[in-house]
Amino acid sequence: MGLSRWHDKNSRPAEEKSEEMQQDAHYYALAASDSLNASVSNEYGNQVMNSFWKVGIDSPYVDDEAIRNRDVENNLPSLKQSVYNANEPNATSSAFSTASYAHETFDFRNLKLR
């Protein structure tokens, strides 16, 4: 009987196994790092979008008297309510019903600047 007959076909040298384990550890470290970066990017993205729309929770534009009066006269929900109320009963009537970015991830890798 030759030695090759007893050789496990799935076994690899210890060096290869060790290298694979290092790659796995590197992958998981990168995955954790990427997750952390995504959450930081998400928070920063929300701040950017709040600035862009000017309807952030602390924005002075949300509580502007003229805007509130106009919305009341036209039977429109306030801008703050439109953007941040996810359970709005009549979402189609709101001008900003699709701007629920505060609860979604924001991926800067897909952002293209001109």
Swiss-Prot record:
Write the protein's name. Uncharacterized protein YER121W
Q: Which domain of life is it from?
A: Eukaryota
In UniProt terms, what function does this protein have? May be involved in phosphatase regulation and/or generation of precursor metabolites and energy.
Write out the biased-composition intervals (Basic and acidic residues): 1-20
Where is region (Disordered) located? 1-22
Give the originating organism. Saccharomyces cerevisiae (strain ATCC 204508 / S288c)
